[in-house]
Amino acid sequence: MNAGALSRMLSEGLAARRAEGLYRSPRVLKSVDGACGLTADGRTVVVFCANDYLGLASDPRPGRVMARVAEEQGAGSGAAHLVSGHRPEHEALERALADWTGREAALLFSTGYMANLGVIDALVGRGDTVFEDRLNHASLLDGARLSGARLRRYRHGDVDHLARRLAEDGGRHRLIVTDGVFSMDGDRAPVAELARLARDHGAWLMVDDAHGLGVLGEKGGGLLEQSGLDQDDVPVLVGTLGKAVGSFGAFVAGRRLLIDHLVQSARTWIYTTAPSPAQTAATVEAVRLARHETWRREHLRALVRRFRAGIADLGLDLMPSETPIQPIVVGEADQALQASRALEERGYLVTAIRPPTVPKGTARLRVTLSAAHTPQQVDGLVAALGQVLGQ
């Protein structure tokens, strides 16, 4: 393919996306302080579409730790973990994460996407089968596809459908993979039933608790803490540090044997530069705050109840979510975009989520709540939604 043909193909694809209302572009916010952001044209908006569930992303304490360590050590690690990039800060964070989640050990990855690709590829391959919920995050589906294992998807949250698929399958090794909290719907996976199925069928269970860690459980240990499941019930736990923890990166936690295996086999960990020591040190502090400042979870839960009650009073439909993810399905992509723009005109930033992220005809306003929000800000959003979507 020559350069001209490539340009034509790209132009046609982009034009089709624009025509369907599916063209994407990053939105620039000059700054975000707590729940408020400053747009490129200088307007202040209340942000209701971030994943900063505990309001830690703008807390000054992790920032001060980062500044101190950056002053001492510079901005980067300089190498991969297995070369010369592994520092005491990485060790400290891995110990803190293992302790928080009740696992023997943890391994730090640069992103959640890399963690999911790396761990699935390290555990299964040709001759094996991966079973995934149809609404799993793209990184989980991509991990299964890239591993070479057979991918079999089951209906969302349907353990009976999964049981039938397990009974029909003759794979050498079988891995059940699920989100803990589903990122676009906000509902929780039936992890206790999945753990039982895994035991009954000799399969392994992997849970990506990106949106549950820090939010669910008495100590913020996530959906597995809330459900009382240990590392034998769920051998592979993935968590992210860029959502409730308010920092950056991800991790895999489980028995020491699992972590030792990943150090040998997880290509997305082996062949990449280790995270910045300064960022990592800041994350250690953020994890401490997420664990011990329980008022953040209590305030967040109160805001979720307040928002749902307000939306119910308006007669609008919400999905059955008790987490900070509160989606309002609008329908077509252009309708969701129009609603998002109308909310921004009223001072509220809520991103429209469109296909292919969600199925066609289910474009939505994905409202996310944070401990940084005030009750008054939540009430203001509810009133604005009533004006924009009022029936």
Swiss-Prot record:
KW Transferase (keyword) present: yes
Any one GO molecular function term: pyridoxal phosphate binding
Pathway where it operates: Cofactor biosynthesis; biotin biosynthesis
GO BP annotation list: biotin biosynthetic process
Top-level taxonomic group: Bacteria
Annotated pyridoxal 5'-phosphate binding sites: G112, Y113, S183, H211, T240
Coiled coil: none
One Pfam family cited in the UniProt record for this chain: Aminotran_1_2
Binding site for substrate: R24, H137, T357
Keyword Transferase part of the UniProt annotation: yes
Record PTM N6-(pyridoxal phosphate)lysine, positions in chain: K243
The enzyme's E.C. designation: 2.3.1.47
Substrates-to-products reaction catalysed: 6-carboxyhexanoyl-[ACP] + L-alanine + H(+) = (8S)-8-amino-7-oxononanoate + holo-[ACP] + CO2
Named cofactor requirement(s): pyridoxal 5'-phosphate
Keywords tagged on the record: Biotin biosynthesis, Pyridoxal phosphate, Transferase
PROSITE patterns, A to Z: AA_TRANSFER_CLASS_2
Family membership noted in the UniProt record: Belongs to the class-II pyridoxal-phosphate-dependent aminotransferase family. BioF subfamily.
Function: Catalyzes the decarboxylative condensation of pimeloyl-[acyl-carrier protein] and L-alanine to produce 8-amino-7-oxononanoate (AON), [acyl-carrier protein], and carbon dioxide.
Subunit structure comment from the entry: Homodimer.
Name under which the protein is recorded: 8-amino-7-oxononanoate synthase
Species of origin: Alkalilimnicola ehrlichii (strain ATCC BAA-1101 / DSM 17681 / MLHE-1)
